[in-house]
Amino acid sequence: VGSEMCIRDRADFDISVAAYPEVHPEAKSAQADLLNLKRKVDAGANRAITQFFFDVESYLRFRDRCVSAGIDVEIIPGILPVSNFKQAKKFADMTNVRIPAWMAQMFDGLDDDAETRKLVGANIAMDMVKILSREGVKDFHFYTLNRAEMSYAICHTLGVRPGL
């Protein structure tokens, strides 16, 4: 954290840090994780970008807890458009991210149908962005995993276009 302050002293940098709506896997508790985020913000971070999540309510509760803890930077939600559910489940298991039962049901039976999986994943991501937008969220971070085409299509469908 000390080196971040050095960087900001030298130039006009924006500093983004990681945040975990469903708690970092190595954190001792949700409160300890929140205090760690506060420490990073107090050290000069301009914004926090969250780990991906699939439960919008977990993000909204986390955002409320951040406000209550005096964290006054934008908490940008991390959105993971899912095209491969098995891979997403593996990522979720490693990162303490809960996959809602409804989501698992939506991908059930699609192991051999990549195109339908992409459509389902894009639809879920679009619904998340729409709900979060209604809750006042203005900026989003898409985890593309080097496959930007799904995120591009999602943004296009939501009205975000180059040059706008």
Give, region by region, the residue ranges found by the protein language model.
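Active-site mouth loops of central-metabolism enzymes
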Residues: 14-32, 109-123
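Short, small-residue-biased leader/transition segments that mark boundaries at the very start
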Residues: 1-7
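Active-site glycine-rich loop that binds ribose-phosphate moieties when present
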Residues: 26-45
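Conserved, mostly hydrophobic/aromatic
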Residues: 40, 44, 77, 140
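Catalytic-face loop-and-helix region of soluble metabolic enzyme cores
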Residues: 78-135
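A structural motif corresponding to the C-terminal end of an alpha-helix
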Residues: 8-13, 43, 128-139
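Active-site beta-loop-alpha junctions enriched in small/polar residues
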Residues: 18-24, 53-54, 78-82, 110, ...
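C-terminal helical cap(s) of enzyme catalytic domains, especially alpha/beta-barrels
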Residues: 148-164
